[in-house]
From Swiss-Prot:
Location of the protein in the cell: Secreted
Keyword Oxidoreductase: no
Positions of disulphide bridges: C32-C80, C43-C64, C49-C74, C53-C76
Family: Belongs to the DEFL family.
Gene3D superfamilies: Knottin, scorpion toxin-like (3.30.30.10)
Keywords noted in UniProt: Antimicrobial, Disulfide bond, Fungicide, Plant defense, Secreted, Signal
GO-annotated biological processes: defense response; defense response to fungus; killing of cells of another organism
Organism of derivation: Arabidopsis thaliana (Mouse-ear cress)
Protein name: Defensin-like protein 18
Gene that encodes the chain: PDF1.5
Higher taxonomy: Eukaryota, Viridiplantae, Streptophyta, Embryophyta, Tracheophyta
């Protein structure tokens, strides 16, 4: 009986050790940033920009950015 328990324990330990090697590899998609083609005016709210990029420009994400704080544009992220 002790031999059986030892064998089962060793098998379970081996399964746990080798389970880590079987983990799937996750590949992150490259995202490219470009200014929204359909946004008009200055961008003040990141949430509105993100919503606009996803719904109108079919992007993955978006946020307000730009060189001057008083005039920022909406930039969208797309899969490259």
């Amino acid at each position: 009986m002790a031999k059986f328990c030892t064998t089962i324990t060793l098998i379970l330990v081996a399964l746990v050790l080798f389970a880590d090697f079987e983990a799937p590899t996750i590949v992150k998609a490259e995202l490219c940033k470009r200014e929204s083609e359909t946004w008009s005016g200055r961008c003040v709210n990141d949430y509105q920009c993100r919503d606009h990029c996803i719904n109108n420009d079919r992007g993955n994400d978006g946020y307000c950015a730009g060189g001057y704080p008083w005039y920022r544009s909406c930039f969208c992220f797309f899969s490259c």
